[in-house]
Regions:
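Extended, solvent-exposed, turn-rich assembly/linker loops in the middle of proteins
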Residues: 16-87
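Long, contiguous amphipathic alpha-helices that act as assembly "spine/axial" helices in icosahedral shell
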Residues: 1-24, 46-56, 156-177
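Generic secondary-structure boundary/loop-capping signal
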Residues: 9, 13, 61, 91, ...
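Sequence/fold signature of self-assembling virion shell proteins
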Residues: 70-191
Length: 191
């Protein structure tokens, strides 16, 4: 699953309800309190206590490292955590919340998918995009769907590298969030 889906989850959530979108810049003094407070709000509104994960922008890792000493929260770094069958290494645990650090370029409120016709293609931050500092969601909330499209098979005549066949395929990915699960999503967005 792509972390670019963070923008899709944020956009969907912000269009329907803004109660779990906190506008704050994460610093050493407020990082732990902001994320813990948002998690508590999401847990209360969704009425589910376990199964959450936080995606945190990597540029805020230092704020959590510096704040780890002066808090009553249990913070540990370098854990291996299994989330939906995938094991992630070097995960920070904030109390019982696994926090996966992801590149800032993937944590934007608006993204633009470039077609590749008149530009280089790929995914870039959209116009007026804000940084998402943290995205909290229940592991069962976003439903990722993959579709195999445009299968091409190359025989020995086209494949000059060796005497055999080669297959090329294009995968399409999408993300769905059921309306009844929106209460289990929260975000901290840069002001």
């Amino acid at each position: 699953k792509s972390f670019y889906d963070a923008a899709a989850v944020f956009l969907l959530k912000s269009q329907i309800d803004s109660t779990h979108i906190v506008s704050a810049a994460l610093t050493k003094t407020n990082a732990i309190a902001t994320v813990s407070g948002l998690l508590q709000t999401v847990r209360d509104d969704a009425e589910e206590m376990d199964g959450y994960v936080a995606l945190i922008s990597h540029k805020h890792k230092t704020a959590f490292l510096e704040a780890a000493n002066g808090t009553y929260h249990d913070i540990s770094f370098g854990n291996a955590v299994s989330i939906n069958g995938v094991t992630y290494e070097n995960v920070m645990m904030l109390d019982d919340l696994p926090c996966v650090f992801v590149p800032q370029s993937r944590m934007k409120t608006v993204i633009t998918v470039q077609s590749g016709d008149s530009d280089q293609g790929g995914i870039v931050a959209g116009e007026n995009a804000k940084d998402i500092a943290c995205l909290i969601t229940h592991c069962e909330t976003p439903l990722a769907v993959s579709k195999l499209d445009a299968i091409k098979q190359f025989g020995p005549q086209e494949n000059q590298l060796f005497d055999g066949t080669s297959i090329q395929a294009r995968y399409l990915h999408d993300l769905f969030v059921p309306g009844k699960r929106l209460a289990s999503i929260g975000a901290v967005v840069a002001p």
